[in-house]
């Protein structure tokens, strides 16, 4: 576990009500496993507690962490307003992580912002036989399908994302 200053590489809208932040944090990326999370200190003096954020991806070779954050409250709204080049304090990796090594076929199931850690698990453990099933509020809220290493079926509450991607 490391407590480090991570540099924001990008911060952009990924889907409706969802922001993708890519951080440069080589020490954490080198240790991170699918299913783990980090604690982020909101970069202002008004927030004392760190925010737990699941890893959407951890690239040890590039030294990067990819996060999907829903800007709901003041803390996550501040995080989602970060600009490339800024630094934020990050503690991690935390949690036990997933263990899917050796599995022949895994069914991945997630919805909304909870798809982010599933994307990390798919990158680590998906096989040709694996399948993913995602649920979203609407098709505009959907993400995580275009680069999935296995077949993905996505559905939405309003029926606008009821197709195989």
Where are these regions (language model features)?
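FNR/FR-type flavoprotein reductase catalytic core
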Residues: 74-165
């Amino acid at each position: 576990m490391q407590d480090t200053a991570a540099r924001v590489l990008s911060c952009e809208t990924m889907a409706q009500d969802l922001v993708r932040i890519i951080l440069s944090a080589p020490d954490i990326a080198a240790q991170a496993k699918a299913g783990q999370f980090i604690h982020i200190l909101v970069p202002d003096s008004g927030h004392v507690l760190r925010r737990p954020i699941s890893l959407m991806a951890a690239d040890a070779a590039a030294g990067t962490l990819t996060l999907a954050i829903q800007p709901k409250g003041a803390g996550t709204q501040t995080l989602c307003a970060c600009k490339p080049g800024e630094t934020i304090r990050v503690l991690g990796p935390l949690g036990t992580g997933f263990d899917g090594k050796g599995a022949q076929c895994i069914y991945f199931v997630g919805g909304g912002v909870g798809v982010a850690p599933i994307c990390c698990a798919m990158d680590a453990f998906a096989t040709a036989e694996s399948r993913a099933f995602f649920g979203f509020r609407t098709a505009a809220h959907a993400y995580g399908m275009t680069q999935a290493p296995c077949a993905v079926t996505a559905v939405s509450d309003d029926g606008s994302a009821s197709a195989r991607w």
